[in-house]
């Protein structure tokens, strides 16, 4: 086994021969040996890896090669701008290729306590240029791969500032964020200026840290200057969806506010009127439909009945009975509808009046033939008077109508109209007198009633209330003073407000002060004396002694009274025995 001097050279051999016992020299030689072993191991590893990779490339066909562009599958060249990371000394295992001597012993350090690796030692991927230079053209079918190869060639011929790894990390960002390889070069050229407006599946996936990492040299490409291009696009746009802001706040004057309010009130009033008119029209239509349906029903029924009875001998009698029943039916249905719709307007009343005049004419014509003209005139006057009565007395309409109909059933047409006119006139006179009486009494009661709370004239026990009694717990002179305030019509001051006049107190209350006051000044004096009173120990003992003496005195009096009672009862009891 050769010595250290033989391995390091002749100079080291002379030095070691002259001074072999020096410990410092031994350490220096060991460090030199370790450095030489490290460099030889690195070169051996690189040679072995390159030879293995070349042999694999020769054995495997070109179509089965991995297409990944990751740095793990790319060959390592000596022209890389970043060197390969050298592992620390504690991770190195003794190599049998170039090391014949074990490394110097080192103390064991737990993995948790080992110092962290420096940032510069981290693995950095090599640039794309090395990958493109060593990669041979592929021989598998040229479908999309031909287009991809052309895109790669075009990308390789671009500016070196975008491709160099050291200038900017964003230049090689397509290694991780590349989804544009499958696109047609014509499509790429056409869609390049409008890259932001492209569809979501055609957009490039941008690096979120591109704007922070790139300083400004890569603003020209589509990936790095996204925010700046968006800002330029926003500045160039002339269309705005937001309304322009007013230059200054508009202050409405009082006149404009009043005009606006008046306009709102008038429009709401017009709307209410239109609604009322529509409602009245609907009611009128409903009433007309009901009456027409009743007429149609009764006429059809009478027609059927008349046609069936005309074949028999009693046709005239059946037709008369049917007419009477029909009139009764229409009267009952009409009175029912009138009771339901008591709140109709004057329009509906006129329509009902017209219908009623027609019905009265038909009744008179169906009745006796002798007094036809007189009954028609009477029925017209009756319809006019009933219309006037319905207009002014809607509440009594149904009752008078029923009474009139019952009279019509039993009397002739002429007598019926005369009695109705007399009844209507009497009823109108009664109603007018009653309304006059009610209005007079209401006006008198309005003038007599006092608004607000009143004092009770009778107490709870039934005795009349004395207006001069202002309470039970009053000091002498307070009642008369309160009576004088009441006679003058002034406010009675509360207790504790003696220093102020009633006008001053009222002014304070109007200003917002609560002038309730405290109790009487005597009570205040007693309260202050009791608060400031301090009882000493001697005073307490004297008070207890006085209380004990009073108690003993009371007990002696009770015992003496009991003895006297016993002495008076004993002689009587002995004499009785």
Curated annotation (Swiss-Prot):
GO CC annotation, single: nucleus
Coiled coil (residue ranges): 529-570
Sequence segments annotated as region (Disordered): 1-479
Start-end of Low complexity biased regions: 70-89
Disulphide bridges: none
Residue stretches of biased makeup (Basic and acidic residues): 20-31, 50-60, 127-163, 170-193, 265-297, 363-385, 396-408, 417-439
One GO term of the biological process aspect: regulation of gene expression
Nucleotide-binding keyword on record: no
Protein's name according to its UniProt entry: NKAP family protein UM04995
Native organism: Mycosarcoma maydis
Lineage: Eukaryota, Fungi, Dikarya, Basidiomycota, Ustilaginomycotina
